[in-house]
């Protein structure tokens, strides 16, 4: 009976250790995914900012061509 108890405790202990290792790997994967999302957000923010500047510049040029500049000319 003592042999069975020791075996059962050993199996349970090894199971808990493997679960702990799997949880750590899962957390690391989630952290990596979060970092990727932050990088994507950073890139999209840069693209969005450049697009806004490009549109503002283009609208200014169009206004100059049409004669709607702000200087009153």
Curated annotation (Swiss-Prot):
One CC-aspect GO term: extracellular region
Pfam families for this protein: Antimicrobial15, FSAP_sig_propep
Keywords: Amphibian defense peptide, Antibiotic, Antimicrobial, Cleavage on pair of basic residues, Secreted, Signal
GO biological process, one term: symbiont-mediated hemolysis of host erythrocyte
Tissues with expression: Expressed by the skin glands.
Signal sequence annotation: 1-22
Subcellular locations according to the entry: Secreted
Cleaved propeptide residues: 23-39
Family under the similarity heading: Belongs to the frog skin active peptide (FSAP) family. Ocellatin subfamily.
Function: Has antibacterial activity against Gram-negative bacteria E.coli ATCC 25922 (MIC=60 uM) and S.choleraesuis ATCC 14028 (MIC=240 uM) and against Gram-positive bacterium S.aureus ATCC 29313 (MIC=240 uM). Shows no hemolytic activity and no cytotoxicity.
Record-given protein name: Ocellatin-PT7
Originating species: Leptodactylus pustulatus (Ceara white-lipped frog)
Lineage start: Eukaryota, Metazoa, Chordata, Craniata, Vertebrata
């Amino acid at each position: 009976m003592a042999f069975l108890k020791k075996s059962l405790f050993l199996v349970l202990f090894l199971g808990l250790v493997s679960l702990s290792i799997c949880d750590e790997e899962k957390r690391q994967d989630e952290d990596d995914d979060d970092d990727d999302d932050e990088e994507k957000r950073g890139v999209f923010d840069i693209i969005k900012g450049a697009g806004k500047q490009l549109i503002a510049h283009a609208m200014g040029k169009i206004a100059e061509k049409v004669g709607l500049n702000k200087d009153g000319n």
